[in-house]
Amino acid sequence: MTNIRKTHPLLKIINSSFVDLPAPSSLSSWWNFGSLLGVCLGVQILTGLFLAMHYTSDTATAFNSVTHICRDVNYGWLLRYLHANGASMFFICLYLHVGRGLYYGSYTYSETWNVGILLLFAVMATAFMGYVLPWGQMSFWGATVITNLLSAIPYIGTELVQWIWGGFSVDKATLTRFFAFHFLLPFIVAALVMVHLLFLHETGSNNPTGIPSDPDMIPFHPYYTIKDILGFLIMLTALSTLVLFSPDLLGDPDNYIPANPLNTPPHIKPEWYFLFAYAILRSIPNKLGGVLALVMSILILAIVPILHMSKQRSMMFRPLSQCLFWLLVAILFTLTWIGGQPVEHPYIIIGQTASILYFLIILIFMPAISLMENYLLKW
C-alpha cells in the first residue's frame, strides 16, 4: 500500500516540499534562515492579528489603544513586544539570508532571487507602515519625512504625496489606510513566499561549494527538519530573551511621547533596520538624488546576477572576493551607525564615503576582482 502522504492531493504537495524533497548533503547553518523567516512571518501574523483586535486606527485613540493593550489586555504587553521585536528578528534573518545568497552565489537562480527582492520590498513597506501605527512622535514624524520624499518625483510628486496622505498632512486618513495596508501586506508576503519556494523547488537548492550536487542528495526529512528545529529553538530563545529582559532595547524612546505635529523631535530616524538606507539617502544633498540612491541601495541586488563575472559560483574558493564581501558588510554596519547619528561633522563625510564605497564595491570592485581571480586561475 502506497503511503498516504504520496497519494493524497494536498499531502503530496507538502510531502514533495518538506519531506521527500531532495536536498544537497552539504548545506550549512546558513541555509536555516529561509525556514527561520517562515517562523518569523508566522509569529508576526499571529501576534499582529491579536493586536488588531484591540487597536483603534484613529489619531485621537491610537496611542491610548496601544497603552490599553500593554496595561489592560491579558498578556497584551507580551503580544506588543513580541510583535515589535519580532520585526527586528525578521530583518536580522532577512539580511543574513540575503548575505548568504550573495556570498554563495544563490542569485544565479534569477527567478527565485527576483521574487526574493520583491519580498524584501514588501516586508520593508509593511514594517514602515507598522511603525506609524502606535502614533508616537517618531511614528508621526517618520511617516511625514519618508512619505514626503515622494514629492521629489517630477511633475506628479506633490499630488502623489497628498494622495497617499489623504489630505494636506499626515492625519487620521493616513493612519487608517496605513493600518489597512499593514494588515493586508503580510498575506501578500505569504503568497510571494509560496512563489519564492515554487521557483526554488524548480531548480533545487544551491550549496556552499556552488558545485552541482545532483549525484549527492539526501531527503529533507529527517536531516534538515531536525536542523531547522534547532534553528527555531535558538531564534525563539533569543527573541524571548530580548522581549522579556530588554523589550525597548531596539526601539526609540521618542515613540512613548504621543504624536504632536507642533513639536519636531531633535533627530528624526526610522527603526534600526532601515538606518543603512536612511544614511545613503541623507548622504546626497539633492532630494531627488537622495531618493534615487535610497531605492537603488536595495534595487542594486537585482543587477547582481548580471555583474557575476567569476567562473565559480560560490565565494568559498575565492579569497579576494571574500575580503571584498566582508568589507561590504563592514560598510553596511558603518552606514547603520551613521544613520542613527545627527547630521553634523564628521558623520556627514563618513556617511558619504561609506555610501560611495557601498555602490563602488557592488558595481565595480566585485566584478573586477572576479575577473582577476579568473585570470589567476588561468580560466
From Swiss-Prot:
A ubiquinone binds at H201. Heme b b566 binds at H97, H196. PANTHER family: CYTOCHROME B (PTHR19271:SF16). The cytochrome bc1 complex contains 11 subunits: 3 respiratory subunits (MT-CYB, CYC1 and UQCRFS1), 2 core proteins (UQCRC1 and UQCRC2) and 6 low-molecular weight proteins (UQCRH/QCR6, UQCRB/QCR7, UQCRQ/QCR8, UQCR10/QCR9, UQCR11/QCR10 and a cleavage product of UQCRFS1). This cytochrome bc1 complex then forms a dimer. The gene is MT-CYB. Heme b b562 binds at H83, H182. This is Cytochrome b. Its cofactor is heme b. Binds 2 heme b groups non-covalently.
